[in-house]
Structures are given as C-alpha cells and as structure tokens.
C-alpha cells in the first residue's frame, strides 16, 4: 500500500513539478534527475566525490550538470573552462551559494570565504589583502615571523630526537601563532591552553563539514533535530568566544597612529565609517562582520597549511630519494650557519618543485568552494542562468592525462626544465590557489610558510618512517580541506647539523 502511495506521489510530483529554465538545449548535458531529489540517486555512493565527478567526465564531457535537490549545478573539469569562470568572467561567477552549514560558520554570509559577492564582501577582502602590507619590513616582517616560528618548531622537535612524532599537532600550533600575529599581533607558548582550544574547535568544525550534509541540499531538513548542526553551533560558539576576547583586547590597545594587524585595520575602517557617517559602510563593520573576517583567516589559514605540510612530509617518506636531493641542495646553498630565507627559493629548486607537485597531486581543496552565477552568463558554448551553482573540480584539472604525464605519480621534476636548473609551469591546468576575484588571499603567506618550514626541518632533521610502522596512507580524507590520515614520523637530528653546531658551541645533546 505504502509503495503505491509513494509511487503515486512521485508521478504527481513529476507531472506538476515546475520545469526548470535550464532545460534549454544550450545548458550543459545533465545527469538524470528526479523531482525533489534531483540527481542524488544517480551519483556514485562510494569513493571520493572529486574522483567520481572526474570519472563522470568520460561520459558527460569536461562540463556537465546535475541537480542537487532542485539546485542546478554545473561541474567544470577542464582548465580552459575553469579559467573562463574564475578569471575572464570572474565577476559574473563570483557569487557564493548560501548553505546552512556554511551560514553557521560565517554568521549568515559575513566575512570573506563564504560571503556572497556584495559590497561588504569586496570591502572586507580589500582590507584583508591590505593587511599583508603591514608585514613587509622591520620586526613585523612576515618572513621574520615565519622563520621565528619555524625555528621554535625545530627547537621543540630537538627535544624529541630519535622519537616517533605526529607532526600535525606541533605544526598546527606553530602555524596558529603566525595567524595570531597577523590578526592580533599576539603569539603563545606551545603549551598555552588557548592553542589547544583553537585546535579543538578548528578540527571539530572540519569534521562536521563533509559532502554528505543533506541539510545543505534540502534546507527544510533544519526543522528536524540534527546532531551535526548542533556540533557546528557548539564549535562556532567556542570560536567566537575566543575571537571576541582577542577583539576586545585589540580595541583596548587600539591606536590610530599605530596600525599593526588585520584587526586594527578593521577597527580603523569602522571608526572612519562612523566618523564620516558613511551609511553604506557602517553596517559592514559590526563586531559580527569583523569576527567573521578574522575567523576566515583562522579557518582558511591554519588547517590548510598544516595539512599541506603533512602531505609534503608523507610524500617525502614515500620518496626518500627526493628528500635526499632537497637536503643536498640545502647543504650546498645554505649550509648550517644560518636559517633558510625565502630568497633561497631561487637555489632550492627541488624543494620548490616538490611543494608545487604536492599542491598538484593533493590539492588543498579538490573541489573549490562552489561559485554562483550573479547574472545570466555562459561558459564555453553553454548558457548558464543566474543563480546556477558552478563547481570547479580542481582534482580533474590536476589529474588530466592530456595535461600531465602520469598524473597519479609523484614527480617533482615535472616542474623543472630538462637541465633541472630552472622552475617551469608544465601546464596551464594548475590552479592550486584558485584564481580571479575569489583567489586565495593567503597565497603569498602559504607559499612562504611551506617553503621555510620544510627547508628548516630538512636542514636540521632526517625524517623517516618509524621502525615497524606502515607508510603514511596517501588516500586522504576530503572535507572542506583535503586532510591526510594521521601518521607518525621518526625525527632524527642530522649529524651534519650536530657537527656544525658543535663547532660554534651551540649544540647541546
């Protein structure tokens, strides 16, 4: 009986459900879809979504569509089309779909990462980018801050010589200090409880954000109890309490003649808007807006960088010959009398190539945060109506056999010329930080952190698989960030480093 009722309801829904505008022949070819549920019944149920979407290109081509519930969504898996969306028509596709889970993270669309492309978003993005200008010179120079934290991390690891360590925890704490310096001009000792609190709510939020949150597809499901949403709310509450405390301290110390961090810039912008009575901007600088922008720096800057550093270590454990080549470069070009600097990138070519290859083979976000068409537009030969969601499958771009030789193989040398003496870009199908109006604002920071941290680690330590332990799993866990499964590494102080420090009397076993 119930089966007949359900069948009848489906038939009626199909007959009377409003036909979408996207039925136009010029709209990208679509997966099958049903009323209400869309294409969900026809999507693969196992494996990583970015890989499944890549495989669907074999049948549907480099651009195709599907329906997530009733929402028309276009999937892009070719770099020419991706660059059209991100760069050539970046403003037309700079919108962000509003989702229940991301709304909780962004105080309902505030900040930068998940905000729609309105005036407030543009203003906060501009101010966030301007904050990096504060860290160009002097003691606040960004490279100086990074090197100090990298050295502190290495000093901590010295106390674990010849031990098996999960590097993710100390790296997370170290990178958090860099973000705290940029946002608040503060830093913390490794054992400070505030760092543990930040790690707890950051990882808690990430664990709640995956590709199976049906409430983002069917928002009406919020009328029912939802454990995931409750967890997100709890973690966001803790996050906001921490950031509010830091914000209030910045307000107390604020000096309009001494702007030293991102929060100072936002406070100053709020004061200017209030003093000039510019009503267009006054509403953009509530504490909620400021907290969301600062929160985006924490959410997008810490776990992403930590994850990539762990991926780099994992691939070096799988490819020890690459690690030895990098250490040889370090020994020959830097030695042991000074800390590596970002200028050394011109000489540590294998290290830079390794970083680029890891960002290719395991992109931070295999599917970039979805975009939304702000107006009726087009991609290639296809018409794209306003409000259509557009997903760039970065995994497809980075694993296209037409663009990359043996794309599933780790080959840093692909980013070097035939002589190994110059860095190259072997394909335009490479967008590890996105591009256009929605490009990652922390790209410069991330590249410096990745280079300097790995250089410092390999200058001082040998990193090996612990005796009897398995190799790190390279499959990964794709959430908002492509995480690697936890693993341990044996940390051993290099003999060459010991000898060099002993000569100048700084080595203490």
UniProtKB/Swiss-Prot annotation:
Matches recorded under PROSITE patterns: CYTOCHROME_P450
Gene Ontology CC annotations of this record: endoplasmic reticulum membrane
GO MF term list: heme binding; iron ion binding; lyase activity; steroid 17-alpha-monooxygenase activity
Regulation: Regulated predominantly by intracellular cAMP levels. The 17,20-lyase activity is stimulated by cytochrome b5, which acts as an allosteric effector increasing the Vmax of the lyase activity.
Residues forming coiled coils: none
Gene3D superfamilies: Cytochrome P450 (1.10.630.10)
Known cofactor(s): heme
Main location: endoplasmic reticulum
InterPro entries, sorted: Cyt_P450 (IPR001128), Cyt_P450_CS (IPR017972), Cyt_P450_E_grp-I (IPR002401), Cyt_P450_sf (IPR036396)
Signal peptide (residue range): none
Residues holding heme: 440
GO terms under biological process: glucocorticoid biosynthetic process; hormone biosynthetic process; progesterone metabolic process; steroid metabolic process
Keyword set, alphabetical order: Endoplasmic reticulum, Heme, Iron, Lipid metabolism, Lyase, Membrane, Metal-binding, Microsome, Monooxygenase, Oxidoreductase, Steroidogenesis
Subcellular location: Endoplasmic reticulum membrane; Microsome membrane
Family: Belongs to the cytochrome P450 family.
The protein's name: Steroid 17-alpha-hydroxylase/17,20 lyase
Native organism taxonomy: Eukaryota, Metazoa, Chordata, Craniata, Vertebrata
Gene giving rise to this polypeptide: Cyp17a1
């Amino acid at each position: 009986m119930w089966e007949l009722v359900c069948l009848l309801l489906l038939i009626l829904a199909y007959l009377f459900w409003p036909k979408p505008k996207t039925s136009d022949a010029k709209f990208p070819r679509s997966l099958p879809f049903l009323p209400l549920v869309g294409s969900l019944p026809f999507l693969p149920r196992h494996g990583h979504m970015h890989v499944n979407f890549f495989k669907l290109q074999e049948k549907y081509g480099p651009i195709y569509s599907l329906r997530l519930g009733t929402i028309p969504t276009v999937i892009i898996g070719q770099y020419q089309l991706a660059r059209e969306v991100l760069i050539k028509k970046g403003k037309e596709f700079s919108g962000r779909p509003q989702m229940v889970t991301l709304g909780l993270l962004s105080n309902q669309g505030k900040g930068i990462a998940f905000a729609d492309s309105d005036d407030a978003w543009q203003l906060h993005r501009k101010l966030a980018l301007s904050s990096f200008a504060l860290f160009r010179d002097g003691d606040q120079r960004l490279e100086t801050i990074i090197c100090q934290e990298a050295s502190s991390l290495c000093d901590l690891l010295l106390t674990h010589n010849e031990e098996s360590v999960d590097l993710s925890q100390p790296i997370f704490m170290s990178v958090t200090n860099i973000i705290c310096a940029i946002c608040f001009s503060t830093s913390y000792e490794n054992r400070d409880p505030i760092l543990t609190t930040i790690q707890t709510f950051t990882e808690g939020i990430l664990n709640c954000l995956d590709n199976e949150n049906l409430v983002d597809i069917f928002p009406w499901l919020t009328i029912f109890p939802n454990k995931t949403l409750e967890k997100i709310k709890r973690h966001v509450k803790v996050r906001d309490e921490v950031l509010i405390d830091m914000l209030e301290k910045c307000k107390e110390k604020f000096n309009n003649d001494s702007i030293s961090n991102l929060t100072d810039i936002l406070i100053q912008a709020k004061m200017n808007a209030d003093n000039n009575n510019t009503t267009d901007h006054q509403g953009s600088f509530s504490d909620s807006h400021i907290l969301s922008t600062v929160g985006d720096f924490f959410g997008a800057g810490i776990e992403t960088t930590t994850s990539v550093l762990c991926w780099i270590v994992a691939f070096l454990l799988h490819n020890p010959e690459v690690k030895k080549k990098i250490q040889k470069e370090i020994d020959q070009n830097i030695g042991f009398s000074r800390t590596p600097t970002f200028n050394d990138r011109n000489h540590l070519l294998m290290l830079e190539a390794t970083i680029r290859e890891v960002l290719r083979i395991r992109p931070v976000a295999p599917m970039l945060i979805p975009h939304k068409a702000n107006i009726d537009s087009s991609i290639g030969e296809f018409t794209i109506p306003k409000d259509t969601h557009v997903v760039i499958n970065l995994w497809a771009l980075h694993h296209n056999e037409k663009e990359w030789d043996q794309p599933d193989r780790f080959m840093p040398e692909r980013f070097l010329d035939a002589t190994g003496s110059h860095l190259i870009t072997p394909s335009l199908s490479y967008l590890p930080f996105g591009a256009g109006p929605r490009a990652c604002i922390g790209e410069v920071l991330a590249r410096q952190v990745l280079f300097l941290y790995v250089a410092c680690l390999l200058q001082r330590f040998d990193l090996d698989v612990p005796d009897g332990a398995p190799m790190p799993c390279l499959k990964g866990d794709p959430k908002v960030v492509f995480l690697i499964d936890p693993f341990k590494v044996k940390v051993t102080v290099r003999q060459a480093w010991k000898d060099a420090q002993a000569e100048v009397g700084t080595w203490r076993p």
